Amino acid sequence: ERSRGLGDVYKRQLQWGGMEMKDMLAPKPIELPADPGAESTSDLAAGIVAHPDSPLLWALLAEQELNQQEGSEPSAFITAYAYARTGYHRSLDRLRGNGWKGWGPVPFSHEPNQGVLRAIAALGHAAKAIGEDDEYDRIRQMLSDADPESVATLLD
């Protein structure tokens, strides 16, 4: 693997008045290691017991619950919201444990990042389902800040 220089990921490109600018203070994109539960997706409950720190497994469990409750009253989404909230917090732990400072790119194209971004998106869906529109908006902005293309993939 070649080393990354200032011309690569350490600079974020901005467009301003048709002129390209580099943000020298922007953090480098986070590329997480493999999710600890990535091999345990066939039995989510057992996988979570074995890997409670897995954002991917919590995201899958929240997505499963959201899909089962589709079309239901808002109160039916409380369990999905709880699963998604847990996945969200596990995601923040995982990001911070790998150098994330609370902002900066988290590319969806890097497969190990997808569990984290899916868990965050699941919280957005669950929040919207129970009428937490402000939280949904914050989650949407968080995903857009992490990877603008992930919004279309995960929320729209």
Question: Language-model features: where?
Answer:
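Start-of-helix signal in alpha-solenoid helical-repeat scaffolds, especially tetratricopeptide repeats
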Residues: 55, 110-113, 117
